[in-house]
Amino acid sequence: MTSHYTILIQWSEDDQCYVVSLPEWGDFCHTHGTTYAEALANAQAVLELLITSAQDKNEPLPPPQLFGRSLQMA
């Protein structure tokens, strides 16, 4: 499933893992992984569950956050 939602991945020294935030889905939508790849895979799985659940309940999906400007290549 392709989605255009934001996935923020940061290393946590306190937790010794990568912590993931999915900001369009609220303040409490997080997951984690011991590696960056695992954190990303977990985030994609959570997003798929959130999207499927909302669609099954006929609930609107939150709008994706858009990057506010064009990228320029160096």
Report each predicted region and the residues it spans:
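Short, charged, surface-exposed hinge/linker loops at domain edges
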Residues: 1-6, 42-74
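Short glycine/serine/threonine-biased micro-segments
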Residues: 24, 31, 56
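Short aromatic-glycine-(Arg/Gly/Cys) micro-motifs in beta-strand/loop hairpins
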Residues: 10-26
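Acidic-residue sensor for enzyme active/binding pockets
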Residues: 24, 38, 48
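A short, exposed loop/beta-hairpin motif centered on an aromatic-Gly-Thr core
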Residues: 27-38
